[in-house]
């Protein structure tokens, strides 16, 4: 029999095992201890514990003997409790169940001091977190150092569970990577405690749950457990360490958690992670030590957990800061590129007051599919973009506000970044080709006006805010760019960003050119813009290529929504690749810009430790081979399909075939001279270009003629405007407001303007009557002035004309003035 005696009261009744189990499940005041000391009578806080008759024999046996009849005297360390009755009851239950089926050996370590901020500051050096820690060890009390794990006093070894400060240094260096930090923590804990497995849980304070970490990937699995669920929940809710010798007998043990790691637990120790602010960070569970976890392990974990908790807290804080930065970057990505750029009022009014122009104003060949639009100069891009909407009739049909359209064009041009290829000049070239296609009879019959308007707007904005990188670069996990975070789940990262920028522009009050449309039509146009901008992704085109071929072979059906969608995607892709369907000189210069952009991305990837593709590596890329392969697989089939649908665009198919032959000839010229291809300078060699034409001419004279066709002056991606002879310019009656004016308009120099005025004065002297009817004011015309004032002829002109007619006298009847209506009526009345 086990006898328990108090100093001033008789022995109390022993609680039943059922009561023990209930108290354990409630967790209110259950304080077990498995630490064993040497035999002898010991006073424990006012209570003396005696053993049975066999106590003397069992003094040298290990603690936790399975025999229920063998007991020994047990000495417990002083407990920090004010309620002695609760402590005595818990000790009774522990001793009563020793060696029975309810003996699961749990130790809720209440004898470990409360983790307070002052205590943690004593343990951690008072230095900034970024400063190197120099203190080699953490001091411990002598009472804690003298810790025994053996019951035999002669075999006892004094251990010092000291934690080197270098471990904390190592943890702090990994606070920028939570997964690597936890991996290092677990490795250190397993090495010092000889545990076989582990589990890590982090505290979700918002949802009051514990989130499970994955052992292999060291990432959050998403599996969550409520506070109080299982041993982990018990440790988290009480913030106490639990050392369990036999988990099969523990009422809190739950196999569901261990099944996540395929662990067959025998014993474990679970300890909370509490930071310097006494906040719960998480729980770490170590499994399956050979002889169970000892008191020495608990002392080590007590000190070790302080370092772990603060390191993980700093890592979580760093992760939260990084998430905030990512959100800020996302907001910046949603901002319109060039939004901070100031659009001058004078620039807006220049476009608003600019008269309607015919396409011949820019060049006689401006409406030719083979004409390189960049040759008109960047100072004409805005004016030509306005002309596209006017020429197709969209301004009148949809009542587009000219000021808002002007602001939209200026804002779109500011939204393109100064990258080598995907810049504002590329957008203008794509829009020019789309305009040529939309004004053909085939497309007018095949697509509706709203679809054509959507295509024109989409071409103008299709690469806005392009970064000069590819989709694959944006989606690389090493980069973690904000664009990939926003759009990686849907694919076509850059194209979706371009569409988002376009919609933000159209929703601005200053750019809302579609404000007069009904809501249904506006949604239709927006959806069409989205689909065709996404179609500029080459991978998306390759997925639709077979469907387009089937549509052409079966015959285009304008009533089919799918056929109209495929046709718009084809027009958009052809417009995006239209630079390769011009003359070879233009194609070469554009290819140089493309590879400058590719090489810049390749250099960036090398800096990030990523091996770039061969065509993006400036040391290994061979441009002719890449271009030949691209034209053969993508470029030539696209324009062959377009020529099948749009007969007026057959010249584009012939041009890209001729350019393909020229690239083959260029490959033959430079292949034997590797040193010449180290840079892109050979793409500008005029002598090499002439030799290429000679090679192609021997093979196909027609292809050589098409490839060598030049429109002078040609400035690919240049800013020099086209300088045509102003006086010899003809509009053939299309530009009604500028028939008499000059082709240069406001962009002509003052010398040219004076030359025009002097010529007009000379002409006015030869015919005074014509001069009166066609007065020139500042290079303008009477038609322009009459349009500004109204459709009526100014009274001063009629007055001057009457004076001239009345003063005229001639003997020739044919030259005499005709009688007025009043004179005719008076003569008839007199008769």
From Swiss-Prot:
It comes from the Eukaryota. One of its GO terms (cellular component) is mitochondrial inner membrane. A divalent metal cation 2 binds at residue 463. One of its GO terms (biological process) is response to alkaline pH. Its cofactor is a divalent metal cation. Residues 341-670 form the PDEase domain. Residues 7-26, 56-68 have a biased composition (Polar residues). Binds 2 divalent metal cations per subunit. Site 1 may preferentially bind zinc ions, while site 2 has a preference for magnesium and/or manganese ions. Residues 1-40, 55-84, 762-831 are annotated as: Disordered. Disruption phenotype: Reduced body size and an egg-laying constitutive phenotype. One of its GO terms (molecular function) is 3',5'-cGMP-stimulated cyclic-nucleotide phosphodiesterase activity. Its EC number is 3.1.4.17. Pfam families: GAF, PDEase_I. Residues 789-802 have a biased composition (Basic residues). This is Probable 3',5'-cyclic phosphodiesterase pde-2. The gene is pde-2. The active site is at 422 (proton donor). May negatively regulate the activity of cGMP-dependent protein kinase egl-4 which in turn controls body size. Keywords: cGMP, Hydrolase, Metal-binding. It is an enzyme of class 3 (hydrolase). CDD domains: HDc. Residues 177-312 form the GAF domain. A divalent metal cation 1 binds at residues 426, 462-463, 576. It catalyses: a nucleoside 3',5'-cyclic phosphate + H2O = a nucleoside 5'-phosphate + H(+). The keyword Secreted does not apply. It comes from Caenorhabditis elegans. Belongs to the cyclic nucleotide phosphodiesterase family. Residues 806-820 have a biased composition (Low complexity).
């Amino acid at each position: 029999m086990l006898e328990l005696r108090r100093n001033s009261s008789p022995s109390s009744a022993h609680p039943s095992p059922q009561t023990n189990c209930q108290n354990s499940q409630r967790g209110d005041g259950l304080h077990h201890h498995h630490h064993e000391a040497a035999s002898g009578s010991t006073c424990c806080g006012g209570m003396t514990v005696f053993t049975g008759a066999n106590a003397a024999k069992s003094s040298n046996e290990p603690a936790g003997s399975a025999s229920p009849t063998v007991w020994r005297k047990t000495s417990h360390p002083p407990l920090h409790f004010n309620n002695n009755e609760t402590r005595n009851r818990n000790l009774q239950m522990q001793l009563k169940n020793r060696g029975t089926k309810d003996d699961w050996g749990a130790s809720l370590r209440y004898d470990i001091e409360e983790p307070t901020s002052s205590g943690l500051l004593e343990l951690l050096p008072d230095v900034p977190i970024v400063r190197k820690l120099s203190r080699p060890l953490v001091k411990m009390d002598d009472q804690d150092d003298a810790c025994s794990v053996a019951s035999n006093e002669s075999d006892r070894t004094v251990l010092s569970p000291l934690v080197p400060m270098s471990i904390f240094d190592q943890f702090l260096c990994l606070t920028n990577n939570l997964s690597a930090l936890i991996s290092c923590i677990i490795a250190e804990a397993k090495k010092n405690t000889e545990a076989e497995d582990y589990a890590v849980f982090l505290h979700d304070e918002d949802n009051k749950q514990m989130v499970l970490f994955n052992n292999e990937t060291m990432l959050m699995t998403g599996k969550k457990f409520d506070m109080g669920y299982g041993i982990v929940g018990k440790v988290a809710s009480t913030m106490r360490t639990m050392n369990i010798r036999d988990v099969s007998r523990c009422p809190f043990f739950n196999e569901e958690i261990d099944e996540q790691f395929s662990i067959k637990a025998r014993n474990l120790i679970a300890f909370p992670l509490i930071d310097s602010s006494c906040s719960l960070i998480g729980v770490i569970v170590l499994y399956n030590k050979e002889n169970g976890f000892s008191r020495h392990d608990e002392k080590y974990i007590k000190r070790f957990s302080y370092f772990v908790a603060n390191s993980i807290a700093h890592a979580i804080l760093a992760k939260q800061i990084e998430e905030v930065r990512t959100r800020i970057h996302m907001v910046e990505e949603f901002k319109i590129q060039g939004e901070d750029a100031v659009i001058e009022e004078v620039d807006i009014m220049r476009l608003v007051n600019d008269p309607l122009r015919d396409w011949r104003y820019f060049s006689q060949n401006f409406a030719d599919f083979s004409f390189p639009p960049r040759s008109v100069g960047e100072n004409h891009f805005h004016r030509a973009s306005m002309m596209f909407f006017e020429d197709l009739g969209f301004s009148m049909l949809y009542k587009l506000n000219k000021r808002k359209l002007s602001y939209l064009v200026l804002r779109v041009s500011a939204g393109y970044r100064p990258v080598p290829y995907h810049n504002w000049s590329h957008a203008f070239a794509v829009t020019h080709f789309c305009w040529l296609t939309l004004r053909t009879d085939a497309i007018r019959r095949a697509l509706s006006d709203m679809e054509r308007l959507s295509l024109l707007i989409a071409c103008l904005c299709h690469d806005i805010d392009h970064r000069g990188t590819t989709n694959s670069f944006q989606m690389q996990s090493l980069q973690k760019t904000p664009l990939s975070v926003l759009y990686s789940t849907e694919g076509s990262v850059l194209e979706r960003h371009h569409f988002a920028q376009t919609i933000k522009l159209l929703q601005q009050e200053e750019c809302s050119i579609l404000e007069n449309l009904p809501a249904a039509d506006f949604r239709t146009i927006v959806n069409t813009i989205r689909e065709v901008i996404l179609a500029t992704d080459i991978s998306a085109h390759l997925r639709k290529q077979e469907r387009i071929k089937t549509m052409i072979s079966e015959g285009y059906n304008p009533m089919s929504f799918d056929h109209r969608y495929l046709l718009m995607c084809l027009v958009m892709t052809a417009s995006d690749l239209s630079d390769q369907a011009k003359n070879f000189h233009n194609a070469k210069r554009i290819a140089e810009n493309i590879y400058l952009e590719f090489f810049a991305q390749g250099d960036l990837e090398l800096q990030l430790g990523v091996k770039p593709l061969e065509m993006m590596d400036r040391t290994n890329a061979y441009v002719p081979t890449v271009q030949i392969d691209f034209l053969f697989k993508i470029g030539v089939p696209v324009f062959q399909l377009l020529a099948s649908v749009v007969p007026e665009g057959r010249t584009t198919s012939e041009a890209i075939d001729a350019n393909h032959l020229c690239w083959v000839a260029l490959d033959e010229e430079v292949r034997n001279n590797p040193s010449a291809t180290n840079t892109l300078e050979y793409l500008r060699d005029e002598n090499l270009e002439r030799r290429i034409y000679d090679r192609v001419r021997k093979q196909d004279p027609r292809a050589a003629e098409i490839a060598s066709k030049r429109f002078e002056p040609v400035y690919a991606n240049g800013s020099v405007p086209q300088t045509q002879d102003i006086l010899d310019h003809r509009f053939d009656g299309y530009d009604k407001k500028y028939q008499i004016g000059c082709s240069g308009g406001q962009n002509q120099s003052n010398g040219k303007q004076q030359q025009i005025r002097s010529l007009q004065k000379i002409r006015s002297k030869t015919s005074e009557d014509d001069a009166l009817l066609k007065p020139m004011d500042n290079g303008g015309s009477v038609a322009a002035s009459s349009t500004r004032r109204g459709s009526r002829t100014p009274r001063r002109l009629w007055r001057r004309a009457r004076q001239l007619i009345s003063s005229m006298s001639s003997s020739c009847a044919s030259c005499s003035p005709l009688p007025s209506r009043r004179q005719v009526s008076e003569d008839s009345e007199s008769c």
